[in-house]
């Protein structure tokens, strides 16, 4: 089991990235916080050491994406009606970034993943291919298609 110092170090290093991945996938602050906690619990129980900081970062990205997918899969099987909650994140954003965020969040999951990892986490296509377990050319194709969709939906100043 990891020490408190290890946990503090990775929290300082990866917390923002993990939160952003959670929100991009789940689109809900409360669910994102639950998955965020699950990711760090998995880290605490993770026995293996990491080969490098890049390996550790990729591990956090992959585990977070998997945890979000598991969360969505679990709740998609449940019949429930969500409570009407004001989406705090959207209210806090200005109109321009809010419009961009809405369009990015509306992308299919595979495109959201590559856009996030490429532009926000600054991974290369080769690194994204490794994280997602896809071929490099697939990542390039998804990036191109995602950009085309964003250009079509945003138009105007974004084109």
Tell me what each language-model feature is.
Residues 34-41, 54-66:
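Structural recognition of an alpha-helix C-terminal capping motif at a helix-to-coil junction
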Residues 1-20, 33, 44, 112:
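A short, charge-rich alpha-helical start-of-domain segment used by transcription regulators
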């Amino acid at each position: 089991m990891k020490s408190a110092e290890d946990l503090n170090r990775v929290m300082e290093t990866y917390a923002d990235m993990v939160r952003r991945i959670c929100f991009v996938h789940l689109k809900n602050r409360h669910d994102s916080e639950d998955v965020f906690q699950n990711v760090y619990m998995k880290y605490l129980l993770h026995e293996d050491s990491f080969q490098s900081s890049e390996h550790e970062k990729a591990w956090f990205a992959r585990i977070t994406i998997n945890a979000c997918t598991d969360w969505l899969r679990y709740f998609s099987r449940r019949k429930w009606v969500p409570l009407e909650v004001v989406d705090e994140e959207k209210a806090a954003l200005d109109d321009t970034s809010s419009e961009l965020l809405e369009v990015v969040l509306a992308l299919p999951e595979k495109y959201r993943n590559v856009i996030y990892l490429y532009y926000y986490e600054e991974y290369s296509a080769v690194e994204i291919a490794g994280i997602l377990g896809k071929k490099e050319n697939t990542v390039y194709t998804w990036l191109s298609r995602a950009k085309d969709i964003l250009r079509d939906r945003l138009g105007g100043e974004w084109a």
